[in-house]
Amino acid sequence: MMRSRFLLFIVFFSLSLFISSLIASDLGFCNEEMALVGGVGDVPANQNSGEVESLARFAVDEHNKKENALLEFARVVKAKEQVVAGTLHHLTLEILEAGQKKLYEAKVWVKPWLNFKELQEFKPASDAPAITSSDLGCKQGEHESGWREVPGDDPEVKHVAEQAVKTIQQRSNSLFPYELLEVVHAKAEVTGEAAKYNMLLKLKRGEKEEKFKVEVHKNHEGALHLNHAEQHHD
């Protein structure tokens, strides 16, 4: 009889410790552990980009509520994640602040099984250059000066191409809007705190396909300007 009671006590005590540790974790008493569980790594390629953008918008909204600010989300520049008691998302964001584009860094802690989401940090990326390697669609570690080829499917390159198409449309008298089909070829160059893009774009207008050579400049504030555009004939 005594032995059975002793065994029951051991089982009950073990369960109590386990439940207490879970409660402490869920209440957020694990900040020290968060930094120790896993290193920061790239977001998996198969992760939904819409999910990352949703976290980015959440971070901006939460910051605006807490600080009574009016920052506007523009795009996700870079996303990394860290396995903790859940996942800590490290985001570099392009933000519109009083009409000017600026870079911010945010950390969002997510525990999906509890439907828990919390903004841990939101600050200006003061040490980040205005033009980064990701702005040129280049791999980290590439530092050669001058013009270099960049992938046409890079998000930043596509963003620049789409802005160029919008400007071409604004300057056109056509009733049919231009649609970007493909970035056929792209080169980029960093000059000081600005960047230049030379691209060959395949566009569609109505049933007709056309190619345009464009040169786009990006200044230190992130503003894009279509410097030159002409039709290209193969």
Swiss-Prot record:
The modification Phosphoserine is found at S174. One of its GO terms (biological process) is response to water deprivation. Residues 133-154 are annotated as: Disordered. Residues 140-154 have a biased composition (Basic and acidic residues). Disulfide bonds: none annotated. CDD domains: CY (cd00042). It comes from the Eukaryota. One of its GO terms (cellular component) is extracellular region. GO terms for molecular function: cobalt ion binding; cysteine-type endopeptidase inhibitor activity. Residues 38-126, 145-215 form the Cystatin domain. The record marks G38 as: Reactive site. SUPFAM superfamilies: Cystatin/monellin (SSF54403). A motif (Secondary area of contact) lies at residues 82-86. Keywords: Acetylation, Phosphoprotein, Plant defense, Protease inhibitor, Repeat, Secreted, Signal, Thiol protease inhibitor. It is found in: Secreted. Belongs to the cystatin family. Phytocystatin subfamily. Specific inhibitor of cysteine proteinases. Probably involved in the regulation of endogenous processes and in defense against pests and pathogens. This is Cysteine proteinase inhibitor 6. The gene is CYS6.
